[in-house]
């Protein structure tokens, strides 16, 4: 089996039918013309935000990570492992793709521990066992994995989806693409940066050009590149025509180098 490719979906993609249609049409064509097994990892911050708003619950973030109190973890689990995950499975079904919905704890694929007590039910993701997902890939399934995990003590944890995708890529020896709303990392003039090293990232963070959630994304990508010993791409899902080339290793967004 070729080494798998993990496609991490994020941003408002889950809210856009047009974007999902484009993405899944591309996935169908790619799976027909390439032998490479694919895995989708997703968060769903916008789904969670809408739900929290509807329930009048405050959304708190610390250093770009969502604070998850004990009384909110069930709601967030429902949004990510439930609504967001099953929405993606429904799109797969619509496109005749045999998909399986999972969370990080299934088959112990990604190990999760509590990251920081102040963040509440927020998990740190580490590589786990590749057995379950490899067996699904060998049988032609598309695993769709939500970024909810569980600790050895049985506590549900909300994991940053970029970090969850990194841990799963390390588990499977997979390549990783982080798809988001932006076409990559932009410089101070709004131009896409083709390649990014840790030193360059630090410089742009210091200058205030990379901020908030993008800091988490860049750090996750740098961490992934270091952990995996290979470049990681941050790119946009908006240009569906570029996705097949991206999936085949052509740099289309910002390539993060270890």
From Swiss-Prot:
GO BP terms: namely: arginine biosynthetic process via ornithine; L-arginine biosynthetic process
Keyword field contains Transferase: yes
Q: Please state where this protein is localized.
A: Cytoplasm
Q: Which UniProt keywords apply?
A: Amino-acid biosynthesis, Arginine biosynthesis, ATP-binding, Cytoplasm, Kinase, Nucleotide-binding, Transferase
Stored Gene3D superfamilies: Acetylglutamate kinase-like (3.40.1160.10)
Write the Enzyme Commission number(s) for this entry. Answer: 2.7.2.8
The reactions it catalyses are:
N-acetyl-L-glutamate + ATP = N-acetyl-L-glutamyl 5-phosphate + ADP
Tell me which InterPro entries the record gives.
AceGlu_kinase-like_sf, AcgluKinase_fam, ArgB, Asp/Glu/Uridylate_kinase, NAGK-NC
- For the site labelled Transition state stabilizer, the residues are 8, 217
The GO terms describing molecular function are:
acetylglutamate kinase activity; ATP binding
Q: Where does substrate bind?
A: 44-45, 66, 158
Tell me its family. Answer: Belongs to the acetylglutamate kinase family. ArgB subfamily.
- Functional note: Catalyzes the ATP-dependent phosphorylation of N-acetyl-L-glutamate.
PANTHER family, per database record: N-ACETYLGLUTAMATE SYNTHASE, N-ACETYLGLUTAMATE SYNTHASE, MITOCHONDRIAL
Summary of subunit composition and partner proteins: Homodimer.
What is the protein's name according to its record?
A: Acetylglutamate kinase
From the UniProt record, report the name of the gene that encodes this protein: argB
